[in-house]
Amino acid sequence: MRRKRPELPEVFVGRDAVREGALRPSDLRGPRVRRLFRGVYCPTGVRVSHELRCRAAALTGEGTLVLTGRSAAVVRGVDLASASDPVDVIALPGCRVNRRPGLNVRRVAIDAGDHQPWEQIAIARPERMTFDVLSTGPLVRAVADADRILRAKLTTVARMASYFEGRHDHGIVRAREALALCDPRAESPPESKLRVRMHFAGLHPEPQLQIYADGEFVARVDFGFEEERLVVEYDGEWHGQGSAIARDRVRQNKLRQAGWQIHFVTKEMMVNPDVVIDEIYGAVLRARSARAHHF
C-alpha cells in the first residue's frame, strides 16, 4: 500500500518538505506550489496575503530578523499592507539575509527591548513599529497609517512622544513631524490624508466635530469650520449603499436647517488633491463672505 504523503503547511521551506517526503524536488518547480521567497513556498490553493508573506519571511531569517513597520502592523491586526507589498524587516547583527524581491531588509540599530519573539524571528513592539511607519514612505501616507494604528489602540500619541524623547535615530525628525499631525479620531485613511493636506494649505477645521442646534444634537461631521459654519465631508463608497442614501439626505437637511453649508469630497476627486484643496479653500471663503453679509 502506498504511503500517504504528509500534508503541506500553509508556508514551508522547500528542502524540508522534500526531506520529509511531502514533495519531490521536481514538485518545487511544478503547479502544486507557489514560491514566496527563495526556498520558501506555499501550496497553490492557499490565498496569499501580506500576513502569509510575513510568515514566509520568518522562515528565511533564522532568528536574525525583526518584522516591523507596516508588516508588523498587519500581524498585529491593522491592515496597512497588501499581498503585493514587500515585507519590512530589520536585520539584527550577524544576519546574512540580504534584500531580495518581496523582502525589504534594513540594517539599522534596534534596541533589544524594542522587539519580542514571533514565529521563527522577532516582531517589533508597537512603539518601534509605529516609529518605522512614521519615518518611512510619503508623509501623508505615514500619518494616515499611524492614525489607524492609534485608532486600533496599539499605542498612543503620549506613548509615542515618550518613546521619541532623547532619540537620535535616522528618521526621528521626520517621525516627530508626522506624529504631530496624527489624530486617532480619523475614521478612514482618506479622511486622514485630506486632513493633512488641508493642514499644509493653512486650513484647520475641527475633525469629527459634533454639531448641536438649540441644545440638540444634529450630526457628527468629518470636518467642521465652526466660524464659517462649513462642513467638509469625505463621501466614501458606503454612502451610495441602500438606505444610507436616505439617512444621508435627512442628515444633510438637518445640517442646512441648522445654518451649516456642506462641501463634499469624493474618492474620485482625491485623484487630484491640489484641486480638492483649492475647492475647499474657495468654499471656506464663500462661507465666510456669506456669514459676513448675514450679520
Which residues does each predicted region cover?
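Surface segments flanking catalytic/ligand-binding clefts of nucleic-acid enzymes
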Residues: D16, E20-A22, L150-F295
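Short gly/ser-rich loop at a beta-strand->alpha-helix junction or flexible surface loop bordering the NTP-binding
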Residues: M1-G171, L285-F295
